């Protein structure tokens, strides 16, 4: 990384089928061992399942789920004078989106059932309804930040 100037962030390309950056970010997060075609198949099938189950636009439902799961604050460990404090820090929009996608996929993988596509579809539907594991993780993160509010002056 150059020391002279800050490197520019490269935005994700829009998805070829749905023409959505969010879908492409989701595909990248599902990706394992560089098999992008497999990841795309999983995500597209999940979006089709969402459309069948809810009779709504799957992209709008995905956006709603990501918005519901996105945390506003997170805690970071900060060492001050021999002890470590959990310091609450506000999250920028891009990082918030990445965290929410990561949580959606993490809790979809933990679900019971057959096929990653159906598990991902169910997790997205639950997140859009403000339920599911990813929503619990968001609430847990917010609770942690609220409990450590006293250390907010140790910001980075």
From Swiss-Prot:
Gene Ontology terms for molecular function: rRNA binding; structural constituent of ribosome
GO CC annotation: chloroplast; small ribosomal subunit
Database matches in InterPro entries: Ribosomal_uS7 (IPR000235), Ribosomal_uS7_bac/org-type (IPR005717), Ribosomal_uS7_CS (IPR020606), Ribosomal_uS7_dom (IPR023798), Ribosomal_uS7_dom_sf (IPR036823)
Subcellular location: Plastid, Chloroplast
Alphabetical UniProt keywords: Chloroplast, Plastid, Ribonucleoprotein, Ribosomal protein, RNA-binding, rRNA-binding
Record Pfam families: Ribosomal_S7 (PF00177)
Domain of life the protein comes from: Eukaryota
Any GO BP annotation: translation
HAMAP family (alphabetical): Ribosomal_uS7_B
Job description of the protein: One of the primary rRNA binding proteins, it binds directly to 16S rRNA where it nucleates assembly of the head domain of the 30S subunit.
UniProt similarity note: Belongs to the universal ribosomal protein uS7 family.
Subunit structure: Part of the 30S ribosomal subunit.
Name of the protein in question: Small ribosomal subunit protein uS7c
Gene: rps7
């Amino acid at each position: 990384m150059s020391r002279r100037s800050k490197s520019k962030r490269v935005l994700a390309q829009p998805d070829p089928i749905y023409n959505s950056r969010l879908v492409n970010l989701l595909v990248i997060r599902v990706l394992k061992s560089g098999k992008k075609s497999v990841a795309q198949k999983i995500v597209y099938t999940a979006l089709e399942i969402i459309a069948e189950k809810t009779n709504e636009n799957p992209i709008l439902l995905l956006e709603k789920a990501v918005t519901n799961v996105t945390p506003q604050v997170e805690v970071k460990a900060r060492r001050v004078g021999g002890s470590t404090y959990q310091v609450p820090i506000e999250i920028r929009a891009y990082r918030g989106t990445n965290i929410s996608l990561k949580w959606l996929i993490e809790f979809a993988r933990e679900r019971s059932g057959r096929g990653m596509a159906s598990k991902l579809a169910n997790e997205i539907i639950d997140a859009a309804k403000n339920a599911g594991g990813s929503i619990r993780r968001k609430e847990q993160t917010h609770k942690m930040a609220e409990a450590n509010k006293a250390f907010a002056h140790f910001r980075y």
